[in-house]
Amino acid sequence: NWKRKLHVSLAFGEQGVYPGELCTLKQIIQNKKRMPLPALQVKFQADKSLQFQDETEAVVTDHYYRSEVFMVGGRKQITRTLPFRPQCRGKYSIGQIQIAAQDFFMSKKYVAVLPENTMIYVYPRQLSMKQLLNHNKQVLGEIVERRSYQEDPFYFRGIRPYQPYDPMKHINWKASAKYGELLVNSFESTYSRDVCLLSDVETDSVFYRQEMQEAAISAASTLADYYLRKGARVSFRTNGREDTDEEIVLEQCQGIAAITALNRRLAGIDLAKDSADFARMIRQIIPNCRQSRQYVCITTRPVRDILEAVTLLQSKAAEVLLVVPQIAGEDVQIPAGALAWNI
């Protein structure tokens, strides 16, 4: 049997990346039997948006089709590393490999299809927060504040003279000996902000439909990254649907690991599927909204029904922001009080 002790596999070198990052796909061929295979053909296809750098053995049309012939000696292993740079958000997989071989007389050809299950997440493209923060820093708020309730020992501010109310454990003995007076470590005061991001993936744009949808997803991912890295607890809800039709709802995530978890869900949003009504989604959370939570609504289409829902949410919650991502060439009327994000 020509397939006996022959193993062919593909494996992405990374589990999750951002668009434009350099990634690798490893192609491994193992022939564990003594008999060599003089001409083993290996074929597979991948999404063309992955943009493989080596196209010498490939054809790119609707997909990236690669076909390569190997001479595999007995008890030998061949490893190919194929670099690529993904260009678009998504969840990409390679489901099968086709192999073919001929006998020594080239009179017979044997073909087999091998199942494969390698996958990579391409996260939403990250946007620049500079333009948004420069104009709206006081609105978005800082997670680290000087006038909060409790000092956090993880946020070191500096050294100051000792005061009678300072605990002994805060005395910096090394600095005190150096300067000849009692000095204590000073810390920033912090609080953990509770943020809920509501993301609309639908758009009214005709000429820039996909660009506007991707801008909304990227804006949600970038804001979530910003808040999570600041130490906030972030909840997330979107009217987009994954390829499994599952609704994307995350509650009170925290920490760097939550960024990966959220981006994986956002990578799986299938824009070909019908999205839920965003205004209705906002109205559904109003009965259970919290005064202590900051709500951030992200939409590229601030139409009447959405604005009415946001206004109703503002009447129930203490802090509600409306963020409107914009792209060049698309004229969107920004409502009063909304934060425009030029992308």
Model-derived features with residue positions:
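Von Willebrand factor type A / integrin I
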Residues: 1, 267-343
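An amphipathic, basic-hydrophobic helix/alpha-beta surface used to engage anionic
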Residues: 2-246, 294, 298, 312
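Short, conserved, surface-exposed binding loops centered on an aromatic residue
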Residues: 187-189, 226-228, 253-257, 285-288
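General structural signal for secondary-structure boundaries
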Residues: 47, 163-167, 255, 277-280, ...
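Short, charged loop segments at secondary-structure junctions
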Residues: 245-276
